[in-house]
Amino acid sequence: MPTINQLVRKGREEIRKKSSTPALQCCPQKRGVCVRVYTTTPKKPNSALRKIARVRLTNGIEVTSYIPGIGHNLQEHSVVLIRGGRVKDLPGVRYHIIRGTLDALGVADRKQGRSKYGTKRPK
């Protein structure tokens, strides 16, 4: 335990919170170009083919991001917007692609929760 004098000289060091999305560099979203679009399998109790993309951001960092929703039109060289948010059963996937912006089209035939998948209101 430090003495009063040691605290006066040095003081307590603040515990800094580690960012869960360091590649965004404190921005809410970042633009990037798809380098590779592929599927992968989730961790132990779950089973599926999850759609993910390797994205090179405008700041030069390359990240793995998840493509939400059913069906997508992304391929290599597609320009996408990514946001933070991890996928629990995919290790190393810390970002989501935002549907309905830039080259990522919204989910077709989506009726509920449309704003999250970039779908316009059906007529």
Swiss-Prot record:
PROSITE patterns: RIBOSOMAL_S12. Keywords: Methylation, Ribonucleoprotein, Ribosomal protein, RNA-binding, rRNA-binding, tRNA-binding. GO terms for biological process: translation. Gene3D superfamilies: Nucleic acid-binding proteins. It comes from the Bacteria. InterPro entries: NA-bd_OB-fold, Ribosomal_uS12, Ribosomal_uS12_bac. One of its GO terms (molecular function) is rRNA binding. One of its GO terms (cellular component) is small ribosomal subunit. SUPFAM superfamilies: Nucleic acid-binding proteins. Pfam families: Ribosom_S12_S23. The modification 3-methylthioaspartic acid is found at residue 89. Part of the 30S ribosomal subunit. Contacts proteins S8 and S17. May interact with IF1 in the 30S initiation complex. NCBIfam families: rpsL_bact (TIGR00981). Belongs to the universal ribosomal protein uS12 family. With S4 and S5 plays an important role in translational accuracy. Interacts with and stabilizes bases of the 16S rRNA that are involved in tRNA selection in the A site and with the mRNA backbone. Located at the interface of the 30S and 50S subunits, it traverses the body of the 30S subunit contacting proteins on the other side and probably holding the rRNA structure together. The combined cluster of proteins S8, S12 and S17 appears to hold together the shoulder and platform of the 30S subunit. This is Small ribosomal subunit protein uS12. It comes from Syntrophobacter fumaroxidans (strain DSM 10017 / MPOB). The gene is rpsL.
